[in-house]
Regions:
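Conserved pre-catalytic core of RNA-dependent polymerases
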Residues: 1-165, 169, 329
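Residues immediately flanking
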Residues: 11-12, 30-31, 41-43, 90-92, ...
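Catalytic palm subdomain of template-directed nucleic-acid polymerases
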Residues: 94-111, 147, 190-219, 236, ...
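Short, conserved micro-motifs composed of acidic
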Residues: 136-138, 224-253, 271
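Active-site nucleotide-donor binding segment shared across nucleotidyl transfer reactions
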Residues: 173-192
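Basic, alpha-helical interaction scaffolds
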Residues: 194, 245-317, 334-338, 366-383
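Short amphipathic alpha-helical coiled-coil/interface segments
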Residues: 322-333
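Extended C-terminal regions of large enzymes
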Residues: 325, 338-435
């Protein structure tokens, strides 16, 4: 039961001759996966209570969008206030594969998991053997003394527990200064989703102290920073890190699949230009197929527009993108001929006689209303809520806070808030008219 098979999956970047550009996925025995899934379901119930940081990976009720939104808003805040600071995107080398089992078992005990749970997890991870599938052949079995198996149903919960100590060390150290949005509120210092770690630091001394913490954490867990892939953006008058750390300074970077940069509008434009180009090329491929109208709509919804929804949850969308996508979709559906069905019928619900085609503008507005719903829900603990309140207070410089969500506002009142929150307010007004 303890023997797994490792299959190497190419990451689709870098040379295939470099082994580090492959991701090891472990295929496990079905009995083991059933047992691991039972334990994972039990752990899901307690993780929200013991993971006190903003870590969202494998924690029930938390969303990756909260992490992306928090980082996006901090960048907007630093640009708007012109305050000093660093936004550092740490790259942990083979994060899951380097976790020491001794540390993993110690963490489980430290978090108070019972003896039975700990023993079952030790059965799953102690004295386990693995073989590698390579070119259709199997290597000889070898013993695994470290790593959290990617492919194990428990991997998300276990790695979240392993990552928590680093986040706690950074958050609790008062010598490490983050960015404070409002007096009386906690400083924003670190955002985590699995091993994707983004630091928000005020000065160089804080950066040095964080790296000391990371080094100490690595000695215990086996974690190691890949300095060549770690990048940072600096804001205000903070010094460059060249000669201090082997990190690359960038104007923009991709964080959790979304491009964020100092030039927020420019980074967004380039991200959508690339995305829309990929969508158009994908539809060219499908044009040669003999598809029915329903088949074409399925292709558009499932293979084209679905790629945009992930980004749209946290990024404002330029108007030209909406226009270009709509034109591209209609050209594909009607084969560049005059439409035979009204657009409102195309996007209408199928149970009401429509065709169910997704509409980018309506989807955007519904996503923005979801943001409002999470914002006014006291059970939601996303750190972006502090920055959203800050930007809502900027509307008209009258500090009306949440009240602006229910008001009809003049265009000039939007000028000092990020484009994303402009879309939020416009969506509120749109649905208030519908109501």
């Amino acid at each position: 039961m303890s023997i797994g098979l490792i299959k190497l999956i190419y990451k689709r970047k870098g040379s295939k001759n470099n082994l580090s550009n492959f991701r090891p996925i472990t295929m496990l025995n079905t009995d083991l996966k059933i047992l691991a899934k039972i334990l994972a379901n039990k752990m899901k119930n307690v993780l929200p209570k013991i993971i006190v940081t903003n870590q969202a990976y494998g924690v029930r009720g938390r969303d990756i969008a909260d992490i992306k939104s928090g980082i996006r808003d901090i960048i907007s805040y630093l640009n708007e206030t012109q305050k000093d600071g660093y936004v550092v995107n740490l790259d942990f080398e083979k994060a899951f594969d380097r976790v020491e089992h001794v540390f993993l078992f110690a963490i489980l005990e430290r978090f108070g998991f019972g003896k039975n749970v700990n023993e079952w997890i030790k059965i799953l991870y102690n004295n386990v053997m693995t073989r590698v599938v390579c070119n259709g052949f199997l290597t000889e079995p070898f013993k695994i003394t470290r790593s959290i198996r990617q492919g194990c149903p428990l991997s998300a919960q276990l790695y979240t527990l392993v990552a928590e100590p680093l986040c706690l060390m950074i958050k609790k150290d008062k010598s490490i200064q983050g960015i404070k949005i409002e007096e009386g509120k906690e400083e924003k210092k670190i955002f985590q989703y699995a091993d994707d770690t983004t630091l928000i630091l005020k000065d160089l001394e804080s950066m040095k102290e964080v790296m000391r913490k990371v080094e100490r954490y690595g000695k215990s867990t086996g974690a190691r920073i890949n300095e060549e892939k770690t990048v940072y953006m600096k804001f205000g008058r903070v010094p460059n890190l060249v000669g201090i750390f082997n990190f690359e300074e960038v104007k923009e970077t991709k964080i959790l699949g979304v491009t964020l940069g100092k030039d927020e509008k420019g980074a967004r434009e380039r991200m959508f230009e690339k995305l829309v180009g990929e969508m158009e090329r994908r539809l060219i491929f499908w044009r040669g197929r003999f598809l029915s109208l329903k088949g074409k709509i399925l292709v558009v919804n499932a293979l084209m527009l679905s790629k945009m929804w992930y980004i749209l949850t946290v990024s404002a969308i330029p108007r030209w993108v909406e226009v270009r996508i709509k034109r591209c979709v209609l050209d594909f559906v009607w084969e560049k001929k005059p439409p035979r069905v009204a657009y409102n019928t195309l996007i209408g619900q199928t149970d009401k006689g429509g065709m169910g085609l997704s509409d980018v503008e309506l989807k955007k507005k519904s996503m923005r209303i979801k943001v409002v719903k999470k914002y006014i829900d006291d059970q939601e603990k996303g750190e972006w809520k502090d920055t959203m309140k800050y930007f809502l207070d900027k509307c008209g410089e009258v500090k009306l806070g949440d009240n602006v969500l229910w008001m009809k506002m003049k265009t000039w009142m939007f000028e000092k808030i990020p484009d994303f929150y402009k879309e939020v307010l416009k969506a509120c007004f749109f649905f208030s008219l519908k109501g």
